[in-house]
UniProtKB/Swiss-Prot annotation:
Name listed for the protein in its UniProt record: Histidinol-phosphate aminotransferase
Enzyme class: transferase
Keyword Amino-acid biosynthesis tagged: yes
Alphabetized PROSITE patterns for the sequence: AA_TRANSFER_CLASS_2
Length: 356
């Protein structure tokens, strides 16, 4: 009699799945954590809601209204979820038939688009970006047949640059009546002028992902948003869990999105941008650094001589960066989160000491 293991009982695509390697999963014993694009210091909040014996609202009114006002959209165009990662998955679950439809994304980019699709059993198609990391519109057009959701990260993680807005318009015209285009704006607070939120009236098939993890300094809260037209939001509401946000999360999110919270976020952004420019200038003078790429975000991508050795050397000194070597076209590249001035100096001093 054959023995069936628990693993044999699992879905085939899950057995073959490589889980997303988050910064926390990769570990490390550092005291300078510059691998997850988090804000470097904690922000304090006081909990005001004490009704933990009751289930929370499915879509907390104060959070939705505050975010709609901040983003310049209507409350009916906002869905709140457990981080933007849940938004990525909800869009696939709502629009893609497993085993039939596909998603499309353009590497090098964020890794969760493929993981979410593979988990659900939806095909992934890739169209690598051009040499300047802009969209290959002809390549996308050639592969659109059967694609229901297209993910474009702008500013892009891990490269740090914005996607050309005219290319976004072309993509939205190419996909009209065929697919949802998802603009992942996790880092848009660092370049708010580039947001596509004002385009929702023009494009019924546009969805925008946002988060409180970056500029709002609340990565531990797990709170994200999908902005889209009401028809899209209503479909996502059919597949979201009944209570996605716990009461304490909703409480803190509403405070972070108050007028005072927005002012504090913008002050943090200004500070991070100033620190980013300081770090970019310093990196350009370091012998083991071959190239520093422009950034519109809270991280910097740079190409190094002997990048694996540099990565390990800093790791051993407790400075944890994010290795991007395995991403298409990013050979020799490491991503560095912009931290405090003290953390920047630790990185600079360690890199200057590298023998190349």
């Amino acid at each position: 009699m054959s023995t069936v293991t628990i693993t044999d009982l699992a879905r085939e695509n899950v057995r073959n799945l490589t889980p997303y390697q988050s910064a926390r999963r990769l570990g490390g014993n550092g005291d300078v954590w510059l691998n997850a694009n988090e804000y470097p210091t904690a922000v304090e909040f006081q909990l005001t809601q004490q009704t933990l014996n009751r289930y929370p609202e499915c879509q907390p009114k104060a959070v939705i209204e505050n975010y709609a006002q901040y983003a310049g959209v209507k409350p009916e165009q906002v869905l709140v979820s457990r981080g933007a990662d849940e938004g990525i998955e909800l869009l696939i679950r709502a629009f893609c038939e497993p085993g039939k439809d596909a998603i499309l994304y353009c590497p090098p980019t964020y890794g969760m688009y493929s993981v979410s699709a593979e988990t659900i059993g939806v095909e992934c198609r890739t169209v690598p970006t051009l040499d300047n990391w802009q969209l290959d519109l002809q390549g996308i057009s050639d592969k659109l047949d059967g694609v229901k959701v297209v993910y474009v990260c702008s500013p892009n993680n891990p490269t740090g640059q914005l996607i050309n807005p005219q290319d976004f318009r072309t993509l939205l015209e190419l996909t009209r009546g065929k697919a949802i285009v998802v603009a992942d704006e996790a880092y848009i607070e660092f370049c708010p002028q580039a947001s596509l939120a004002g385009w929702l009236a023009e494009y019924p098939h546009l969805a925008i992902l946002r988060t409180l993890s970056k500029a709002f300094a609340l990565a531990g809260l797990r709170c994200g948003f999908t902005l889209a037209n009401e028809e899209v939001i209503n479909l996502l509401m059919k597949v979201i869990a009944p209570y996605p946000l716990s009461t304490p999360v909703a409480d803190i999110a509403a405070q972070a999105l108050s007028p005072q919270g927005i002012v504090a976020m913008r002050e943090r952004v200004a500070q991070i941008i100033a620190e980013r420019e300081y770090l970019i200038a310093a990196l350009k003078e370091i012998p083991c650094v071959e190239q520093v790429f422009d950034s519109e975000t809270n991280y910097i991508l740079a190409r190094f001589k002997a990048s694996s050795a540099v990565f390990k050397s800093l790791w051993d000194q407790g400075i944890i960066l994010r290795d991007q070597n395995k991403q298409p076209s990013l050979s020799g590249c490491l991503r560095i989160t912009v931290g405090t001035r003290e953390e920047s100096q630790r990185v600079i001093d360690a890199l200057r000491a590298e023998q190349v």
